[in-house]
Structures are given as structure tokens and as C-alpha cells.
């Protein structure tokens, strides 16, 4: 990088809220499998606390040495449904508690991998883990869970879609805020550093470092310099900015991996917003030319942003992965919150936006009396977008117990707050209750 670019990067950190959103260490737990659940959990605790013992210390040192803010230090593990399947426990709440205890000991912010992959069907461990989710996630503060219900190669497991609607509903009855720790995927990726969907894939190395970047404020500031210019210029400006942001992510990842003696995995090219003013994906879209997010043209502007971020990021880093695109979580983005409060953005428009960006209906609050079948319908719609378009999509929806449209639910910190949004009241119950599996699309047959 030239001196001018280095100075620009320093300015991004000091003035434009550029940071590393997360350094996530992925850890395989296959060598912790045991038919005795107590022994398995002790092995898990020992491996986590040994493998990641220096993670927080190294991240803090990088932060102070290079002046680059690192917001979260996280861990992802092999899906627990696979690790716990060998034991004879009736439920896996104790595994979540072991993960929580390890995270507390290490001082990490979150730990992901209380997960199951059921896109084509269940094995015994999947059933036990999913049934344990409401209790496990409500009793822990740092544990995150995910379930993959569909893929382009397998289609959509509608039995799992039906069950996950009920799981979300059951969890919200215990503690609505805990729903932010649960995400339901199609085409889940194995190297995702972001929560709540991170897990350590079966094809990954024993340990790996993955980095998630941020930087919506940086992109917005860059676009302020090209007001009124053509869309080509907008795209080029975003690409150049994404290059610098990603370069910093790779640098931090390499330094951390070397210090921890762990392979460097990927940089996730996702623009991750926070509730802070000036750190919003919605504000980027408005800078491109929309009066408000949700206006006609929103999906096109988001597609432009997403594509330009990827093109710039790929040039800056030899290994990219994860979700890689723009995140549009309602509660974590001040511009999204404002658009919902003013009635400019609804669930249907959000769903359309998810067809061209990372993830899906994310951190969306709905009325507490929303039926489980309606939540299942939302999950099925998002899964269909992912399966047909060969991309990752997800649902992280929060039924706000005791609240109605227009009220708010507060998650605190970087998770912000969400206005409760109206949901179409027509029932998909008969569709959801059919069960079975939606077949894989015709274009999935690539061989």
C-alpha cells in the first residue's frame, strides 16, 4: 500500500468507525467424542481452554500495538449434534453449559456451534440437540446455536422447518432476548466467523483463525465524495474502499494466526453495522440515492453494494469466505431501525433484499402472539431463496413476548433494539404441517 492509503486507513479507524468486528477461532471437537457424556464434556472443556488460552490476550495486544479496534473475540466449534451423538444423554443442555463455562474461563464474547445440520434428515444427535435448544440457549449467555434446514443440493427439510418455528416460539416464551442466539440457515457455511451462525465445519483444520470485518461508515464517507456521479463511479468507489478494509482484516488475521500458531483461514467480506450513528448499511443505500431504505430501488442499490464489496475484497485477500456481503440486521443498524419506525421498511421488502445480500431476515422482532407456523413459513421462504439462488440465507427472528406492533425490544450493546414489525396474519399452517422434503432444484445437478 502507498503512504497515502496507509494514512487513509488510519483516518478510517479514528474518524469513520472502521474496526475488526471479530476474530473467531474455530476448534474441532472430534477428538473429544466419548460414549460417556461426562467424560466428553470434560474433554471439550479442556480442549477449548487449552487451544484458545491466548486468544483474548493476542487480540488485545494487536489492538494496542497497531491501533486497530477488535470488537469481539469468539470461538466456533464442531456442531455439537455430531460430537454428543455417541453419548446416551437424553438432552444436550449440559454440553451448552460446558461451552458457556469454557467461554467464561477464556473471556471470549461468544461461542458458536450448538448446532445441527439437518438439510436432508435427522440423526439421533440432531433430534436431541434441537429439542434441547430452548432450555440450553435461555440458560446460557454466550452460547449460540444454529440449524441448517436446507441446501441447494439437498432441498428443504420441511419437518425441520416446522420444528424450528416451534423451537423459536418456545425459546421466546422463556426469554425473547435469547432468540438472538439462534439462527436457522439454508446453505450454511463452514467457516463463518459471525454469530449466531458460526460453527467449525467438518472439512476444516483442527484449529483455524477467521476474521470478520466491519466498516459501513467508511463506505458511506467515501460515497459522500462522489455525490451525483454515475453508478459506475459508485461501484468503483465501493470496490476501492472494500479493498482497504479487507487488507486490514487479512493483516490482523495473519498476525493473530502467527502469534497463536494456528493456520489463518479466511476473511469474511461482510459489512457488519452497529446501532451507532454513522455505522449503518442503510445509510450507505441512502447515500447511493434512496430517500429511505425500503423505497423502490432498494434491492438494486443493495445488489450493487454487495457485488462491489466482494470484488474489492477478493483483490485484497487470497482467502475469502464466510458469508461475505452486506448484513441487514434490523436491530443492529440505526438506519434500518429508523426506516421501520417511519413505516418505510416492512418484512416483505426485507425478504426481497435478502435475495441479493448476506444472510436474511436478521434480528427482526415480530409480535409475541405470532404463531409458530407463521415463523416456520418465514423460515421456509428464506430457505427457498437460498436454495434456488445457491446462496446462504437465514432467519433470526424474535417473537417479542407480550409486545405488539410499534413497541420495542432491547438487546443491549452492539445488538441494539428492534421495533416490533407487523406480520401477514394469513396462516401457512396447512402447508407447514404437510412435512416432508422440498426437492432440490433442477439446476443443482452439476456433475
Curated annotation (Swiss-Prot):
Record SUPFAM superfamilies: PFL-like glycyl radical enzymes
Coiled coil (UniProt feature): none
Membrane spanning stretches: none
Self-association state and partner proteins as the record states: Homodimer.
Family: Belongs to the UPF0210 family.
PANTHER family: UPF0210 PROTEIN MJ1665, UPF0210 PROTEIN SPR0218
Protein name: UPF0210 protein lhv_0606
Organism: Lactobacillus helveticus (strain DPC 4571)
